[in-house]
């Protein structure tokens, strides 16, 4: 069994405001992230993502950063982090992130009209973060070459799909009766 699948099956589940979360090194930073798990994930992303002609990797803070940094190192594609803090730099674009559990403002810097981007994130759950991000990238005039998330949590509204985008995933899971259940070992293409 691969490490990503096993690590999800072993993940503890917590409940917050009626929403069930798995606690995982990729999505939460705890338990500790082992290098062999990160390496496996990065290799799977590189194999699955459409990387030809990509100018930049774009990832939302905070839990996409470690994944995207590793992919950037392996592909030599520069990394742009969409931040939760406004800096007021020239060209900064704001977006409203609405997820199943929070609402925040985020800020895109260093993405320009005509840039060809790969969007990477840790988990696709409600699609709120990625829907807001793809909308901002469209407004900028960037070309979204591909969207890849490590984990898809099934069972929720997918605002990203509602906006006409499809995210590739490495594995699809659900939380049933307090446990992670693997719905698709290989995720979505």
Swiss-Prot record:
Gene3D superfamilies: 3.40.50.2020. The keyword Protein biosynthesis does not apply. The keyword Transferase applies. Pfam families: Pribosyltran. Its EC number is 2.4.2.-. Keywords: Purine salvage, Transferase. GO terms for biological process: purine ribonucleoside salvage. GO terms for molecular function: transferase activity. PROSITE patterns: PUR_PYR_PR_TRANSFER. InterPro entries: HGPRTase-like, PRibTrfase_dom, PRTase-like, Pur/Pyrimidine_PRTase. Belongs to the purine/pyrimidine phosphoribosyltransferase family. Archaeal HPRT subfamily. May catalyze a purine salvage reaction, the substrate is unknown. PANTHER family: HYPOXANTHINE/GUANINE PHOSPHORIBOSYLTRANSFERASE (PTHR43864), XANTHINE PHOSPHORIBOSYLTRANSFERASE (PTHR43864:SF1). This is HGPRTase-like protein. It comes from Halomicrobium mukohataei (strain ATCC 700874 / DSM 12286 / JCM 9738 / NCIMB 13541) (Haloarcula mukohataei). The lineage of its organism: Archaea, Methanobacteriati, Methanobacteriota, Stenosarchaea group, Halobacteria.
């Amino acid at each position: 069994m691969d490490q990503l699948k096993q690590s999800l099956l072993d993940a503890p589940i917590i409940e917050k405001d009626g929403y069930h979360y798995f606690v995982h090194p990729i999505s939460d930073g705890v338990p500790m992230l082992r290098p062999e798990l990160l390496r496996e994930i990065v290799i799977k992303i590189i194999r699955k993502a459409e990387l030809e002609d990509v100018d930049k990797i774009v990832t939302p803070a905070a839990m996409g950063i470690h994944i995207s940094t590793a992919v950037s190192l392996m592909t030599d594609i520069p990394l742009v982090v969409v931040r939760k803090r406004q800096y007021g730099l020239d060209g900064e674009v704001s977006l409203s992130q609405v997820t199943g559990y929070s609402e925040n403002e985020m800020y895109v810097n260093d993405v320009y009209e005509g840039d060809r981007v790969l969007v990477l994130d840790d988990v696709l759950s409600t699609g709120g973060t990625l829907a807001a991000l793809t909308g901002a990238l469209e407004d900028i005039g960037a070309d979204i070459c591909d969207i890849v998330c490590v984990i898809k949590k099934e069972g929720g509204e997918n605002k990203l799909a509602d906006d006409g985008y499809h995210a590739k995933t490495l594995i699809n899971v659900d939380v049933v009766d307090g446990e992670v259940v693997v719905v698709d070992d290989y995720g979505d293409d």
